[in-house]
Amino acid sequence: MIYKVFYQETKDRSPRRESTRSLYLEVEADNELEGRIKARKLVEENTDYNIEFIELLSDKHLEYEKESGTFQVTEF
């Protein structure tokens, strides 16, 4: 499963829409909820990011992200 994680680079400031960034994670999970929990844990253990939202990508959404040219799976 591929998840898109929306985040702010620091927890010190209030979140601003203009500075929201995203990364993609491939997570092995039995269901969507378990995948979101694992994705959050991976990001929190390896970064100081302020996580805003974690989204499971559907096949169509994943194809769109790949075509946009910015798709790259992050590995920790």
Curated annotation (Swiss-Prot):
Keyword Transferase included in the entry's annotation: yes
Name the record gives this protein: DNA-directed RNA polymerase subunit epsilon
Source organism per UniProt: Streptococcus gordonii (strain Challis / ATCC 35105 / BCRC 15272 / CH1 / DL1 / V288)
Subunit relationships: RNAP is composed of a core of 2 alpha, a beta and a beta' subunit. The core is associated with a delta subunit, and at least one of epsilon or omega. When a sigma factor is associated with the core the holoenzyme is formed, which can initiate transcription.
Family: Belongs to the RNA polymerase subunit epsilon family.
GO terms, molecular function: DNA binding; DNA-directed RNA polymerase activity
Phylogenetic placement of the source organism: Bacteria, Bacillati, Bacillota, Bacilli, Lactobacillales
Chemical reaction(s) catalysed: RNA(n) + a ribonucleoside 5'-triphosphate = RNA(n+1) + diphosphate
Keywords, alphabetical: DNA-directed RNA polymerase, Nucleotidyltransferase, Transcription, Transferase
GO cellular component entries: DNA-directed RNA polymerase complex
